[in-house]
Amino acid sequence: MDIKEVREYLPHRYPFLLIDRVLNIEPGKRIEALKNVTINEPFFNGHFPEEPIMPGVLIIEAMAQAAGILGFVTENKKPSDGYIYLLVGTDKARFKRQVVPGDTLHLFAEYVVIKRNIIKFTCEAQVDGKTVASAEMLVAEQKV
């Protein structure tokens, strides 16, 4: 899925669109997406100018966006149909390594269960095959 199609499944736009490409998606199962981290990211101006590190909360957001795409594809819906997914909870969030300019962030999400329009995902972010962050995420479908 290229960036044009990614934009069909996510309502986010610059500077908050954190998915560049989807490499693999199995509806109802899993997704693998990419975020190319460059020095031009606006958050590096303040986090930290001399030693730029991607903020952990933005890694969480990138994993949530990958999970959102998986949710939309699984449910056969798009934001243009009048739906969005909201991040309503995270559990077991862990940060193991820093993400810096030049890294390619591989984002994985697995669909666990859906109950009352809330989907649970397990998510992981990797750089060079090494885990940099992981979390369980809850997203809720909302009609807009």
Swiss-Prot record:
HAMAP family per record: FabZ (MF_00406)
Record-linked Gene3D superfamilies: Hotdog Thioesterase (3.10.129.10)
Enzyme class: lyase
GO molecular function, one term: (3R)-hydroxyacyl-[acyl-carrier-protein] dehydratase activity
EC number(s) stated in the UniProt entry for this protein: 4.2.1.59
Function: Involved in unsaturated fatty acids biosynthesis. Catalyzes the dehydration of short chain beta-hydroxyacyl-ACPs and long chain saturated and unsaturated beta-hydroxyacyl-ACPs.
BP GO annotations: fatty acid biosynthetic process; lipid A biosynthetic process
InterPro entries according to UniProt: FabA_FabZ (IPR013114), FabZ (IPR010084), HotDog_dom_sf (IPR029069)
Subcellular location: Cytoplasm
Family to which the UniProt record says this protein belongs: Belongs to the thioester dehydratase family. FabZ subfamily.
CDD domains recorded: FabZ
Active site as annotated: H47
Signal peptide: none
Cellular-component GO terms for this entry: cytoplasm; membrane
Name of the featured protein: 3-hydroxyacyl-[acyl-carrier-protein] dehydratase FabZ
Reactions mediated catalytically: a (3R)-hydroxyacyl-[ACP] = a (2E)-enoyl-[ACP] + H2O
Pfam family of the protein (one): FabA
Keywords from the named record: Cytoplasm, Lipid A biosynthesis, Lipid biosynthesis, Lipid metabolism, Lyase
